[in-house]
Amino acid sequence: MYKLNNEFEINYNKEIIPKKLNPDLDKKLEKEVNFFLKWGYLIIDKALKDNQIILLRKTFNKTFKKLKGKDHIDYNLFEYDKNFLFLLDNKPVIKRISAILGNCIQLHSASARLSSPGSKNQKWHRDGHWPVDPNGTPIGSIPGQINCGYYLDPLTEKNGPIAIVPGSQKALFKPPKKDFEFPDQKIIYAKPGQAIIFNGWIYHRGLGNKSKSNRRVCLICYQNSWMKSRETFDGPIISKIKKSGSSLQKLLLGSVNKW
């Protein structure tokens, strides 16, 4: 027979929970938030310094060389090499993520993808599976996931840029999983050093790589702290950060696991 345990134990320091739900925004940041809310994406310039780009490229190459032919890492990227870790709370990005989602945020997933020469166009898709209503629910909740792409190679027509349909995060239906061009699609030619953030529910896809070189990207995605994460948060590198990291790092790494 199942034995009931009426004791409820909080196993984290409550001090890591933000005191305010929303940060204060200056005029520039407020303008960026409004743009994101309308169109579903934002390009952040100077999100990475030159030395960080060099470090990421070196770490990315070393990591995928060990994987022997594998072309993607779906989650737990930080467990592959601690040199990826600074992306977790990268200030230029976290500033925008908090401005949009609020201060109570968590890592949804940390992944990476290598698109080799000859890779095909992706089909249109959304990353979120929950239904969409642009008005949210009467109490105000809405499934929130923001993807952040750090492209380590300049995106061109040949190596495959990103295609999105601005504003489609509000559509009540999923896109057809086909290879075609929307008349109002936007092509983004991301540059190394930029971060491309976009709503997980926006219609998007990566185009095929017709060049002779690999296309490399690290994808660090965020959500509200109370949503389920794809990450396990239990690897040796992450476990160490959850013990000794900053309050923000602990929050991002799922330390508030119940309430």
Residue ranges: model-predicted function:
Residues 81-84, 183-184, 205-207:
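Active-site rim elements
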Residues 109-112, 148-150, 218-222:
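A structural signal for short, well-ordered beta-strand segments
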Residues 155, 201-202:
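Short Ser/Thr-interspersed hydrophobic loop/turn segments at strand-loop and sheet-helix junctions
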